[in-house]
């Protein structure tokens, strides 16, 4: 997601107050960084608990699809499915995209946790997909519930960890930040730009990439790609300034086929 218009407009100016809060939070966040373990490319258990797989490798149990113009639970054109044990976003039954964006929501909300997803882009974008959506998916974190989505709503209010695949030439980072209906404090100020780029490498072709995100409630988030820190920010909030302490997890269907080998969560101490 990037290049599309914001869906919600800010209803209240945040300004100096949250910027100062971000500065005051800095020392706490720094202390947590020192205590946090480095992300593991492999592994199941840590001192804080056990990685839990959100995807069982067989079907969509625990997940609910929602497409623009369709009720929650309707898997439009069988877009989300399991293929050879991989959670797949497929467009082989589509002829034209027509802006029917979709999301697949996990059943449980989370607050303080790490999420680790192994993903890749495959095939070609479906006809009619927007240019910015080519080789584009996302982990929608701290999101609204699928039940609260309106029938024609494009995207859930959430913090999006934008997953991008590289093109033939040029740089195209992944694990970026996009903010549908939200803002964050970035570089000690409330940043209202819709998308912010990470400092990751570019990943071309159909190679598998591991994206891990450390989420600490309303305090802040950190993105890692293949174990390397890609970006960090604080105080995730709705457009009206309400801090987001917890929310749903969903993946996207934005017009390009995508596969997930695994999606795991490790809940961490507050």
Predicted regions span which residues?
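Bacterial N-terminal signal peptides
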Residues: 15-26
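Carbohydrate-interacting regions of secretory-pathway proteins
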Residues: 28-270
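Bacterial N-terminal signal peptides that target proteins for export
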Residues: 2-16
